[in-house]
Amino acid sequence: MEYTVNSFSEHHAKLNTQINAGDAPDVFWVNPEYMRDFVDRDQLMDLTDLMDKKGVDVSDYLPSSLEKMQYVGEDGDTHIYGVDCCIVGPVIFYNKDLFDEAGVEYIPTKKEDQWTWDEFVENMKKLTKVEDGKTVQYGTSNFEEKFSLYTTLELLGSNGAKWFNGDYTQAVGIDSEATRDTLTKIKELRTVYGVAPNPTAVGVDTSHSPTQMFMTGQVASIFVGSYALQELSQSGINLGAGLPPKMAEGTKPIGSANLDCIWKDTKHPEEAFELVQYLTSVDVCSDVYKTGLWMPNRVSLYKEENQDKWYNPEVYPQGWLDMTWLWTEASLRPFDHLRNTDEIYDTCTVYMEDYFYNDGNLDSILPEWQEEVNALLEE
């Protein structure tokens, strides 16, 4: 078996080129936001019959994982074109020592104790330190995250902003009051309350990236995908983890992760599917789950009697098991069933940065933003 590695920035374009040239690998991973384009181009093998033939219990996949794997064809039937191995989604990691110094209670891990947005802001104020007119410690960071990741999208959904219709063919809620309210609150963390750093000031200095600022004590907490735990658990920080704050009725978590797919024209379909089964098996993935990089994507693994297959108390912060609903109840990340996703990402970045950093007006930005995304979805 030959194994090749691509950089993420060129991976999907290179795959498309290889497939068009008839020289693609038999098995490859695809980030879910690119799946619809590969499916629409008829480049992936339909795994539905093989899954059934091999007795794969698809009902054991978490709802968001199964939705990500399934596509409704022109025949109206559901088809599976890729298999995932995990789920990730955003949580708030924090430095317990900095919370103790400020006399701030730890961020709740139980749903019934979850902070409201206002409670979160007030506590982040207590964690922010200013010396001689300069902020030397911020309360939190990474809420202004790019749309290809998680935090901004989760807050939008939690505040009731439903950006797309049911089959992800039309943008319906970019220009909405929920979007206005969410983006305003995120920006105010930095511009009104001063509890978050300006990410545009980072430049190429990676020592001031959100993660590095957190690990060096310049920020007390960071809102980021759960995958960050693998790195943060090795940082030496007295690490805690808690629920994101509620914006409206409560958090509506999102989750995602890449899928393993098979080239439609592979000469070895049975062997390729056997490899996909191996790569996505619990036996293989459990070792990665225990590092904190991934969370399990199977319903059965969250049952108490199976938690020892993934839960590592030396890695996962106290209270983590209270938060597993963030993954078991997660919805699919809304960008994961779009077409022309790269172009949509670029458009979203332009409009979001115009508002966050150029004092753009949401009343004029959001209608244009929605119109441009719809034009891309119609291409």
Residue ranges and their predicted role:
Residues Y227-E231, N258-D342:
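Mature extracytoplasmic/periplasmic domains
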Residues N238-C261:
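Periplasmic-binding protein-like
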Residues P32-V91, D118, N238-P245, D308-E314:
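Hinge/lid segment of periplasmic solute-binding proteins
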Residues E122-K125, Y168-G203, S233-Q234:
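Glycine-centered hinge/linker elements that transmit conformational signals in sensory
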Residues D75, V315-E372, L377:
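C-terminal capping/gating helix-and-loop segments adjacent to ligand/active sites or protein-protein/ligand interfaces
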Residues V72-C86, P90-I92, D100, T116-V172, ...:
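Extracytoplasmic/periplasmic solute-binding protein
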Residues M1-S64, D97, E101-G103, I107, ...:
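Extracytoplasmic "Venus flytrap"/periplasmic binding protein-like
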Residues T48-Y61, T109-D113, E131-D132, Y138, ...:
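Short, solvent-exposed loop/beta-turn-alpha elements that line the ligand-binding surface or hinge
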